[in-house]
């Protein structure tokens, strides 16, 4: 078969960085972040979190090619901050949201188990 090995979808090549940033010299306070071995899931999550930030003028993402699992996120900020700070802030916020979601899930599973144990 011509299909690539499945591990190639998520294992980074030796020496490759997961995230790289390139400043846009044509637009003030703009940068492009490339995230390797990711897809629309992470691209849209980060974009939506960035859009909620008051300092963001533009945030968008694209996948350069359907068979390449890389996401390009382009960001432009106002003069109050820079794109790197905004991405770091959005990633911290997403991390807190996922931790909260995990804790809520575990709590609900425990409640369900406790109710089920009463009837056994």
UniProtKB/Swiss-Prot annotation:
Biological-process GO terms, alphabetical: transcription by RNA polymerase II
InterPro entries: RBP11, RBP11-like, RBP11-like_dimer, Rpo11-like
Ion transport listed as a keyword: no
Keyword Transferase: no
One GO CC term, this protein: RNA polymerase II, core complex
Superkingdom, natural source: Eukaryota
GO molecular function annotations of the record: DNA-directed RNA polymerase activity; protein dimerization activity
Keywords noted in UniProt: DNA-directed RNA polymerase, Nucleus, Transcription
Short name of any one Pfam family annotated for the protein: RNA_pol_L_2
Localization, UniProt: Nucleus
Record's subunit section: Component of the RNA polymerase II (Pol II) complex consisting of 12 subunits.
Function of the molecule: DNA-dependent RNA polymerase catalyzes the transcription of DNA into RNA using the four ribonucleoside triphosphates as substrates. Component of RNA polymerase II which synthesizes mRNA precursors and many functional non-coding RNAs. Pol II is the central component of the basal RNA polymerase II transcription machinery. It is composed of mobile elements that move relative to each other. RPB11 is part of the core element with the central large cleft.
Family of the protein in this entry: Belongs to the archaeal Rpo11/eukaryotic RPB11/RPC19 RNA polymerase subunit family.
PANTHER family referenced in this protein's UniProt entry, alphabetically: DNA-DIRECTED RNA POLYMERASE I,II,III, DNA-DIRECTED RNA POLYMERASE II SUBUNIT RPB11
Protein name listed in UniProt: DNA-directed RNA polymerase II subunit rpb11
Species whose genome carries this gene: Dictyostelium discoideum (Social amoeba)
Lineage: Eukaryota, Amoebozoa, Evosea, Eumycetozoa, Dictyostelia
């Amino acid at each position: 078969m011509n299909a690539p090995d499945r591990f190639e979808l998520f294992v980074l090549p030796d020496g490759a960085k997961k995230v790289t940033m390139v400043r846009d010299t044509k637009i003030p306070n703009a940068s492009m972040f490339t995230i390797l071995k990711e897809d629309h899931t992470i691209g849209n999550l980060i974009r939506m979190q960035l859009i909620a930030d008051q300092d963001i003028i533009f945030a968008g993402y694209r996948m350069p090619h359907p068979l390449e699992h890389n996401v390009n996120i382009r960001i432009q900020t106002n003069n109050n901050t820079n794109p790197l700070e905004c991405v770091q802030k959005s990633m911290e916020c997403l991390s807190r949201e996922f931790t909260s979601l995990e804790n809520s899930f575990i709590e609900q599973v425990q409640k369900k188990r406790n109710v089920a144990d009463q009837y056994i």
